[in-house]
Curated annotation (Swiss-Prot):
Source taxonomy: Bacteria, Pseudomonadati, Chlamydiota, Chlamydiia, Chlamydiales
Organism: Chlamydia pneumoniae
Protein name: tRNA(Ile)-lysidine synthase
Family statement drawn from the similarity comment of this UniProt entry: Belongs to the tRNA(Ile)-lysidine synthase family.
Gene Ontology BP, a term: tRNA modification
KW Cell inner membrane (keyword) present: no
Gene3D superfamilies: HUPs
Enzyme kind, highest EC tier: ligase
NCBIfam families cross-referenced by the UniProt entry: lysidine_TilS_N
Amino acid sequence: MVLSSDLLRDDKQLDLFFASLDVKKRYLLALSGGSDSLFLFYLLKERGVSFTAVHIDHGWRSTSAQEAKELEELCAREGVPFVLYTLTAEEQGDKDLENQARKKRYAFLYESYRQLDAGGIFLAHHANDQAETVLKRLLESAHLTNLKAMAERSYVEDVLLLRPLLHIPKSSLKEALDARGISYLQDPSNEDERYLRARMRKKLFPWLEEVFGKNITFPLLTLGEESAELSEYLEKQAQPFFSAATHQDSQGELPCPDCLIQQAFLCKWVMKKFFNNAGIAVSRHFLQMVYDHLSRSSCATLRMRNKIVIIKPGVVVID
């Protein structure tokens, strides 16, 4: 089955992604059987990527065992190795099913990655997934540098995660499959409004687009990209100040010269990283208090859980 279309032939981002891929390695594909992962399945075949398909059967539906069998048969027809992992009732638990399932799913993928010495794990996250994450983080008041959750290439410990579809909307993936008569699974949990993602997908995004009168997915993607660029920029700007900081166990000292204090956003970002490196999670309110003392060249002693933060003109000390 070939998926070549105007979308894929003209997609320079996909071309760049696969041009940089080490084709001598064998990869893993997380294959749910939904439109997203099935599209990626055929795309990897078309691009000549060697991979093993990994399917996790959560046992949530009476049809899940049959669906797993059909995916195994598909892989056999296409000459793709297939690995099935079926969760037991004990493994699934009875609370926070969505999060528990995700943890089990990734744990098995990471274990398979190491056992098979794979080159990476392909995941079929797409533009809508990314936009949902950006909006969720924005509404949760995440820092401006932390809005983008997923990258085309990222590492979790020693595991390489590959997401080549982040710039492509789900509708385009489904259209490509529908145009070729390729059937895919419809997961009812994607429509189950007990889950936040489903509520965002079914209610929040359509409502915002109706009220706003425009598609909001790609503006959110742009915001996520700029968030990642801002993070990279701040890392470079902050490096001289980090280099001057000292850490010993959970204590530390951060010099804050006037040139840093005069840049409020950068100064608070540097301080946040400084506290994080000492194992201290700080709120925006706390950072603002510390910054206010620095900007006024005033002294203060603040308690933060079991730590004492001492502020003097031009320096912050963790004791």
